Amino acid sequence: LYLYHTVIEQDSDIHINPQNTLNEGLNIRTVTRLYTNGGDLYPEITDRFKSINLPKWIDFKIAFGAELVPPTKPYLRFPTFSDKILVFNQDISSDLFAYIEDEYMEEETGGGYFTEGLPSKEDLVSQYWESMLTIEEYLNYKPYKEPEILIFETVPAKLIEYIK
């Protein structure tokens, strides 16, 4: 099974040279595209709801995203090389991000514009943790439509293939 990581086109304002990734491996410092990471939106709440039984390596500050299907070229491709790859429900991350948008737009909208009808941030973070699966579990059951795949360690450079 391969995972994929988009490379933003070179003529884009946000292009990051993939050569860094090919030299050093893929990690939070060498990503070529930002993906959603619901666990890092409200770190204080995320930490409060984190089970004490979870491994220490689950640290959203170092996590970065990937995809299950090949995106539009160019992209990076690598095998699922580790058990430090987890899947969360991306819809929950989107709902959490609505709170970020609400805070940003509060002066203009009066607050609550993006979050009306949503559960509290705390409830969403709790649901986010409950949605956590290993990549194998997700592939076996596919309990939600939009997976948020997060990798919690560096993908070794020797495993990465650049597809142009």
Where are these regions (language model features)?
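Nuclease and nuclease-like effector domains acting on nucleic acids or nucleotide cofactors
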Residues: 1-2, 6-12
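Short His-Asn-centered micro-motif
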Residues: 4-6, 66-68, 88-90
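Conserved NAD+-utilizing ADP-ribose enzyme module
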Residues: 10-16, 20-36, 62, 73-164
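Short aromatic-glycine-(Arg/Gly/Cys) micro-motifs in beta-strand/loop hairpins
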Residues: 35-57
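A short linear-motif detector with a strong N-terminal bias
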Residues: 43-46, 64-67, 128-129
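Extended catalytic/binding region for NAD+/ADP-ribose chemistry, centered on the ART fold
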Residues: 53-77
